[in-house]
Amino acid sequence: MKKPLLLTLLCMILAGCDNPKSPESFTPEMASFSNEFDFDPLRGPVKDFSQTLMSENGEVAKQVTGTLSQEGCFDTLELHDLENNTGLALVLDANYYRDAQTLEKKVQLQGKCQLAALPSAGVTWETDDNGFVVSATGKEMKVEYRYDSEGYPLGKTTINSQNTLSVTAKLSTDSRKKLDYTAVSRVDDRQVGNVTQSCEYDAYANPVDCRLVIVDESVKPAVSHHYTIKNRIDYY
């Protein structure tokens, strides 16, 4: 076989040598739910997933699991925060998410399957023209969310009567490594913490294994917490 033909075939097998396919953008639902329920957003035809946050001692600190329809709606979402002994399990039912155990209506939806309101807490969400949640308003607070051109969350600003808390993320310059980032937290103009994360990725540019360092700068000296994140993702 001639070398040029061999190279051409290799390029076809590898999905293009110099022009690889760009990863998919984040859907409005995935990006918005990750903001509200505090997990790393995923892209592509995700069928189900789990994210497990583990301390440097190897203990599970938090776990998130979810199943999605082919249209990208969350059919189920379950969260367990072992450090704070809290949890939540939601199941989709028409225009609501119900508590998976009590079947109580918890979250009201808008559009296809986007967040609209949390009646028990008096919280309502507003979306932009693309369907991304850009603000949440409650009785004594308002949260504003920011995204990049591919729908990745860039941070949020929470305003209440006492102060303003802002989180701002700076992403990797590699568009396939969105979960490699640094983020800074501020209360008013005072920096109180920072986060650094780096990951290994699969063919869909989703994180498989991540290393997370959280630095609490509100205390002196600052305290660092090291975690690993294990992701399991199944696709359609």
Swiss-Prot record:
It comes from the Bacteria. One of its GO terms (cellular component) is plasma membrane. This is UPF0257 lipoprotein YnfC. It is found in: Cell membrane. Residues 1-16 form the signal peptide. It is a lipid-anchor. The lineage of its organism: Bacteria, Pseudomonadati, Pseudomonadota, Gammaproteobacteria, Enterobacterales. Coiled coil: none annotated. A lipid is attached at C17 (S-diacylglycerol cysteine). A lipid is attached at C17 (N-palmitoyl cysteine). The gene is ynfC. Its main location: membrane. InterPro entries: UPF0257. Keywords: Cell membrane, Lipoprotein, Membrane, Palmitate, Signal. Belongs to the UPF0257 family. It comes from Salmonella typhi.
